Amino acid sequence: MPKPTKPRSGMHRREPGRLAAMLLALAAASPCALAGEGGTSHIMPGGNATMVDLPPTSPGGFFKPMVIDYRGEASATIPTAAGVVANLNADASTLVLGGGYSLEQTILGGAHFSVAAFLPYTRLSISGNSAALGGVQIQNSVSGLGDLTLVPVLLAWKSDNLQYDVLVPVYAPTGSYQTGRLGNTGLNYWTVDPIAGVAYSNAKTGLSAAAHLGLALNTENSATRYKSGNVLHLDTSVQQILPLGSGFANIGAEAWYFQQVSCDSGAGATLGCFKGRTAGIGPVLGYIQPMGQEALIFEFKWLPELDTRNRLKGDYLWLKMVYKF
């Protein structure tokens, strides 16, 4: 990864690689879905994958709102807060507001240190056939605050064309949750998700790539006595930055593979081990607008799930914005 360079007014249109460096300085961790209770989890494809999601490498604050839309279904039997349900259909839209701050001082051999927090607001409509009611369809719609994401550790080391990252998102059960209700905006358990990654950026060509590996560790849902298994997740991306108008466009692709590595457990895990997975690939489009010493970035991605087991299968639509100040 090239050495840090701050965006300037009149940035030369023939230097797209500078924008790769800028992207690394404008990123943050994402907030809060795999098998387990409800066929979902706190982590989801698209959260930490592209250059805009990398930990910051320059001091200052950042604001990062996001919009996430998901539509999925599952013909398999799924454990939920309303009991065992088949033929689930879910439609969720989430607005996430958050941001953080990066310190000027470095630690641990030159690591840039940042903290961040994100709070989602979700509208969810869900339906399915209840096993306890003999297959009768049940449904509900709910909206409200979701589970808060705290990121007390965001570390980034830069060395030439490479950046090495360590981040530790913590998902707190602050969202609305009721047993007996099919849909909830919160999951009612904690998740700690340590992640390590590496990113490459070529300052001459504008080519960038990133890969991040994490392990989501879940606690038990005290209301249902259900402990969702831990999830190993890999997110990768490749992007190319090109001059466009007064700024720069980036185009690329993102791929992921999430695998549950431990069984669901607890008195409420009536379906047994119930390990799940999801994998897919989708396009990523973005635009970077330099504004003197600041910059504004937009990113859109469509992430269809191509292979799933014991969970909902559908499509994620992400719209992210990052403003560095």
Predicted regions and their residues:
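Residues on the lipid-exposed face of transmembrane beta-strands in outer-membrane beta-barrel proteins
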Residues: 65, 97-103, 150-156, 168, ...
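Outer membrane beta-barrel transmembrane domains
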Residues: 39, 76, 83, 223-325
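Short loop/turn motifs that connect adjacent beta-strands in outer-membrane beta-barrel proteins
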Residues: 36-38, 52-60, 72, 103-113, ...
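Surface-exposed strand-loop-strand hairpins of Gram-negative outer-membrane beta-barrel proteins
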Residues: 37-42, 70-94, 130-141, 182
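Transmembrane beta-barrel strands of outer-membrane/channel proteins
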Residues: 44, 61-71, 115-121, 166-172, ...
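Extracellular loop and loop/strand-boundary signature of outer-membrane beta-barrel proteins
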Residues: 50, 81-87, 134-140, 178-184, ...
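Cleavable N-terminal export/targeting peptides
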Residues: 1-44
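Residues that define the transmembrane beta-barrel architecture of outer-membrane proteins
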Residues: 89-97, 111, 142-149, 186-192, ...
